[in-house]
Amino acid sequence: MKIKAVGAYSAKQPLEPMDITRREPGPNDVKIEIAYCGVCHSDLHQVRSEWAGTVYPCVPGHEIVGRVVAVGDQVEKYAPGDLVGVGCIVDSCKHCEECEDGLENYCDHMTGTYNSPTPDEPGHTLGGYSQQIVVHERYVLRIRHPQEQLAAVAPLLCAGITTYSPLRHWQAGPGKKVGVVGIGGLGHMGIKLAHAMGAHVVAFTTSEAKREAAKALGADEVVNSRNADEMAAHLKSFDFILNTVAAPHNLDDFTTLLKRDGTMTLVGAPATPHKSPEVFNLIMKRRAIAGSMIGGIPETQEMLDFCAEHGIVADIEMIRADQINEAYERMLRGDVKYRFVIDNRTLTD
């Protein structure tokens, strides 16, 4: 079936309207009318071929929310009319250790929502900057937020799970001191989630202008990471630090803030590598630096349910489909609080 979308035909061209083809629903498929799609910084990197392997036409978008309009005859979990979401994963091998553990995000054959090989036309997946999507029911997520919050739920499908998964894995909660480095699309979700989990949350920023905003998001304390005295006041005190900053920076500034056995987890994907950290800062206190990538389907559903229970959504700015190129330029300038979301109804305007 032919539908409307927005994508790019090359790395050097702006995004533009295009027609794409979606498969007809199979026995286990769910067909979703997309209401809103979040704009992730990785969309920009991929569509401009700043990350290797982009294939064109490229239709980005992996923060998808909408309503079920049709299901295959073997679908058991969903029915037409249900509010649902699709995140970064639309398929995986389903039988490896990672898939059996519900960690499809680490499956070696995980299929991303866009720019991954697929038997469907045109040979690679096309994302949520489009009217509809057809997905196997295993990778569809139920949304329990009220309809009026649906647009602000969209970024939870990437920014939400990217921060929730490491916070849960490293057991953020009451009695734990948790740092969140960066107050952007990822960081603002990390602050909200860590606060809701009951941790003592310290936000790190290089911008004095973000100090009050971080407190409003739920931070108990805010530190200007360029202020040596403020940083020194927190030496050897953190159980866990969630580092959301993608730009290369000095990791040693933050590893020294960890307690013995503390961990700093990186979730920002840098275009160029970070400088190697000072190993003695790690071995002298058995500190660790780790990484984390989105989350599996069961954990993503858990995150959505947690957010619905605690009234958590992203802080967003709604845009029309014809404003995506402008939104990309604004993202590069850091001119967004904190996530753009496309109103997909405007694809037909």
Curated annotation (Swiss-Prot):
Keywords assigned by UniProt?
Answer: Metal-binding, NADP, Oxidoreductase, Zinc
User: What does this protein's UniProt record list under function?
Assistant: Catalyzes the reduction of a wide range of aldehydes into their corresponding alcohols. Has a strong preference for NADPH over NADH as the electron donor. Cannot use a ketone as substrate. Is a major source of NADPH-dependent aldehyde reductase activity in E.coli. The in vivo functions of YahK has yet to be determined.
What EC number(s) does the entry state? 1.1.1.2
Q: Species lineage, top-down?
A: Bacteria, Pseudomonadati, Pseudomonadota, Gammaproteobacteria, Enterobacterales
Question: Could you tell me which InterPro entries the record lists for this protein?
Answer: ADH-like_C, ADH-like_N, ADH_Zn_CS, CAD-like, D-isomer_DH_CS1, GroES-like_sf, NAD(P)-bd_dom_sf, PKS_ER
Per the entry, the cofactor note is: Binds 2 Zn(2+) ions per subunit.
Per its UniProt record, what SUPFAM superfamilies does this chain match? GroES-like, NAD(P)-binding Rossmann-fold domains
Source organism (scientific name): Escherichia coli (strain K12)
Protein's name according to its UniProt entry:
Aldehyde reductase YahK
* A matching Pfam family: ADH_N
Gene name, Swiss-Prot/TrEMBL:
yahK
**Cofactor(s) needed for function:** Zn(2+)
The entry's Zn(2+) 2-binding residues are 93, 96, 99, 107
The organism's place on the tree of life at top rank:
Bacteria
Extract the PANTHER family matched here.
ALDEHYDE REDUCTASE
Q: Tell me one GO molecular function of this protein.
A: alcohol dehydrogenase (NADP+) activity
Query: Catalysed reaction per UniProt?
Result: a primary alcohol + NADP(+) = an aldehyde + NADPH + H(+)
Matching entries from PROSITE patterns are given as: ADH_ZINC (PS00059)
Q: Which family does it belong to?
A: Belongs to the zinc-containing alcohol dehydrogenase family.
Annotated binding of Zn(2+) 1, by residue: 40, 62, 158
Temperature-activity profile: Shows a constant increase in activity until 60 degrees Celsius using butyraldehyde as substrate.
